[in-house]
Regions:
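A short, well-ordered alpha-helix in the C-terminal region of glycosyltransferases
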Residues: 312, 319-334, 343
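Aromatic "clamp/platform" in nucleotide-sugar-dependent glycosyltransferases that forms part
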Residues: 258
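Nucleotide-activated donor-binding/catalytic signature segment of Leloir-type glycosyltransferases, i.e.
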Residues: 215-252
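Donor nucleotide-sugar binding/catalytic pocket of nucleotide-sugar-dependent glycosyltransferases
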Residues: 104-108, 113-167
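Conserved donor-binding/catalytic core segment of Leloir-type glycosyltransferases
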Residues: 126, 164-190, 196-201, 211
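Acceptor-binding helix/loop patch of EC 2.4 sugar-transfer enzymes
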Residues: 32, 78, 82-116
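Short hydrophobic beta-strand element within catalytic cores of glycosyltransferases
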Residues: 275-278, 288
């Protein structure tokens, strides 16, 4: 926002001292092999609200913005409240299954109450995908809901001509070769096994394929065509440059994710002109438009289906180049922070009384 000449007063982090009162609760639930989210307790939500209210009183504030619904749940500051996030609690609870199975029934009920209360309290709630917005629409007036996709977190210095040139170069020098890139930290949920099997099938079909894996450690024996690179942090210049080099050198981004609320990594793939091949699940379809900047396969689709779609791209230079160009266009038009933040600023401005 500051980059777009908006005055921003930051209150972060919020004090969490009140959480110490709930140490016995954490201990008991852990002993029962369950968990509880302390941020959903009203007393903690009220403590957050008091901090924000005091901050607002001492400054000239037009709009309160939060990237989470939690701090604004019980906020009463007399100002418009805007939030921007990637999902609502009840959708995540239903969608992610195992990840929420350890929560107590009371904890789940509090989570749903917190989200619904926050949505009633805010002026506008923006979400990173249509899937997330649909979940929120079950809790509040849909007129206050907006879709704003998340952008790429990697710097982009190239232009459309560079993308066209690189795509043509890749297909002219790698006629029966394919460099796949997989980026994800949860091997099972991100579909690592499907990615490995896809690469195996492509090799069996006569397409010399290498799969580079970032983030996750593959389960089981690592085949010779798989290169496991471990976790690479974007927080360091060295790590950021390594990721840039990997995206730039890859042909296709593959992520057979079983559950995904949003897709920053798909925005990053598009920013380098990489077609993505993934499942049409959760918020993914807002980042990978089937037939535009990649292919979205129906959930449960086999590795053979992934291999088939990738083989089509590899064996048709014109089709690959078209995907690559459209991917970069999607990044320039939608999947970048500048565009989404500019829309967010307009949304915030519209909430301010004249």
């Amino acid at each position: 926002m500051r980059a777009q000449n908006v005055d921003v007063e930051v209150l972060s982090p919020l004090s969490t001292r009140t959480k110490y009162l709930f140490a016995p609760v954490k201990f008991i639930t852990r002993a029962r092999q369950k968990s509880v989210t302390l941020d959903h307790f009203p007393v903690i939500l009220r403590a957050y609200a008091r901090q924000i209210e005091a901050f607002v009183r001492q400054r000239s504030i037009d709009v309160v913005f939060s990237p989470s619904t939690i701090p604004i749940t019980l906020l009463q500051c007399g100002k418009p409240i805007v939030t921007w996030t990637d999902a609502v609690f009840h959708s995540m609870n239903d969608y992610y299954g195992k990840a929420f199975a350890h929560m107590t029934k009371a904890a789940v009920a509090r989570g749903k109450w917190q989200e619904e209360t926050a949505l009633r309290n805010c002026s506008v709630a923006a979400y990173a995908s249509a899937w997330a917005l649909e979940g929120a629409s079950r809790l509040t007036d849909s007129t206050k809901l907006k879709i704003l996709p998340f952008g790429s977190s990697l710097p982009v210095t190239h232009n459309a001509d560079d993308v066209v040139r690189l795509a043509a170069e890749k297909r002219s020098t790698r006629k029966k070769k394919c460099e796949l890139l997989f980026v994800g930290v949860n091997w099972e949920r991100k579909g690592g096994a499907v990615a490995v099997e896809t690469a195996r099938l492509l090799n069996d079909a006569g397409i010399e394929t290498r799969l580079r894996i970032v983030g996750s450690q593959p389960v089981g024996e690592i085949p010779p065509f798989v290169e496991a690179l471990g976790f690479i942090s974007k927080s360091s210049d060295q790590g950021k440059q390594r990721l840039i080099d990997l995206f730039r050198s890859a042909d296709i981004f593959i992520l057979p994710t079983k559950a995904e609320a949003a897709g920053i990594v798909f925005s990053e793939a598009s920013s380098f002109g990489l077609p993505s091949v993934t499942y049409a699940t959760g918020g993914v379809s807002d980042y990978v438009r089937n037939g535009i900047n990649g292919v979205c396969i129906e959930p449960g689709g086999s590795a053979a289906k992934f291999a088939c779609e990738i083989q089509k791209m590899v064996e048709s230079p014109s089709e690959y180049e078209a995907y690559s160009i459209r991917a970069f266009q999607e990044y320039k038009n939608r999947l970048n922070w500048e565009t989404s933040v500019r829309k967010l600023i307009d949304i915030c401005a519209q909430t301010v009384p004249e």
